[in-house]
Design a protein with these regions (language model features):
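Short amphipathic alpha-helix that is part of the acyltransferase structural core
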Residues: 1-28, 66, 119, 129-173, ...
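N-terminal charged segments
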Residues: 1-86, 168-169, 180
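Conserved beta-hairpin
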Residues: 43-48, 100-114, 183-197
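A conserved beta-turn-beta hairpin within the catalytic core of GNAT-like acetyltransferases
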Residues: 55-64, 116, 203-211, 220
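Acyl-donor-binding surface of acyltransferase catalytic domains
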Residues: 70-151, 247, 252-254, 270-274
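Conserved acetyl-CoA-binding loop-helix of GNAT-fold acetyltransferases
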Residues: 74-83, 215, 221-238, 260
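A conserved beta-strand-loop-helix scaffold within acyl/acetyltransferase catalytic domains
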Residues: 165-218
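C-terminal appended segment following the main domain
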Residues: 226-279
Length: 279
């Protein structure tokens, strides 16, 4: 009988680690954007343990993380966070863990916010007994991209979304910035020496955050995504991480694939926005 995997308890301490890791990854992205495009006004602040970041009005990174997760949030704190976004002409969004202090949710409700988006936050232990062994040499190989391959990595990543031209253009610009994140590690999957898939990894306080994985249309069904996942897990182990995390749309193919690879849902995070007509 196969030995069952064990997982850290999905408690407040774990949520704090996971949310801080994602917040730090996004702040590193914002800083990379600010270095490359000073006119973008990209920046971030911290208020009462909440990380608020601006990466552009339409960027999915323009929001907060860790709201109510390390200390209770006051009305004055919320006012400061809202002013940060409003001064930059951006809408206000908050990603909130269900393990946040309940008073934070009550405060958001009183202030005119509503939930509108859900994310499965997934995790697994990173230990030698669960990380897949390195693949034998073959047609498919995964490696770290060199710094002089940032454009190759960005182009490969974006081509995975090329069936939707508007999204492909956005992902190319996004990936070019992501390749220069201070905490980022870029991986390429190659078939017969040609890049067919790309994936990213950031590390913060022993948590490895997996993100940005995509496969070019002609390279699909070759096992590239599984190979990328396994290679990043091995790298995380080598770097001393004890937990890996990734986020997915609930019930999506990405979630199912992650669960096949040993990830499980820690909790479902909720994104909040102002109700129409609220001040």
């Amino acid at each position: 009988m196969a030995e069952l995997r064990t997982y850290p308890f999905a408690d407040l301490a774990l949520s704090q680690r996971l949310e801080r890791a994602e917040a730090q990854s996004n702040m590193d992205f914002v800083e990379a954007r600010a270095r490359a495009f000073p006119e973008s006004r990209a920046r971030h602040i911290e208020v009462a343990g909440v990380h608020a970041m601006f990466d552009g009005i339409d960027s999915p990174l323009t929001q907060t993380f860790c709201l109510g997760l390390t200390q209770p949030l006051t009305s004055e704190d919320l006012d400061r966070l809202e002013s940060f976004f409003k001064d930059l002409g951006a809408p206000v969004f908050h990603e909130v863990s269900p393990l946040a202090d309940p008073s934070a949710l009550a405060l958001l409700n009183r202030a005119g916010y509503e939930p509108f988006e859900f994310t499965s936050v997934m995790y697994q232990r990173v230990t030698a007994d669960v990380v897949p062994a390195g693949a034998k040499p073959g047609r498919l190989a995964v490696r770290l991209a060199r710094r002089d391959e940032n454009e190759v990595w960005a182009q490969t990543s974006a081509r995975g979304w090329s069936e939707t031209p508007e999204l492909g253009e956005f992902m190319l610009a996004f990936s070019r910035v992501s390749a220069h994140k201070a905490s980022g590690h870029s991986f390429l999957a190659e078939l017969d020496g040609q890049p067919i898939a790309a994936g990213g990894l950031t590390i913060h306080e022993g948590v490895a955050l997996f993100a940005g994985a995509s496969t070019v249309p002609e390279g699909r069904r070759q096992g590239a995504q599984n190979a990328l996942l396994a290679a990043r897990l091995r790298f995380a182990l080598e770097q001393g991480c004890d937990v890996a995390m990734m986020c997915a749309l609930p019930g999506s193919a990405s979630q199912r694939n992650a669960e096949r690879q040993g990830f499980r849902i820690a909790y479902t995070r909720i994104k909040w926005r102002r109700r129409p007509g609220s001040v």
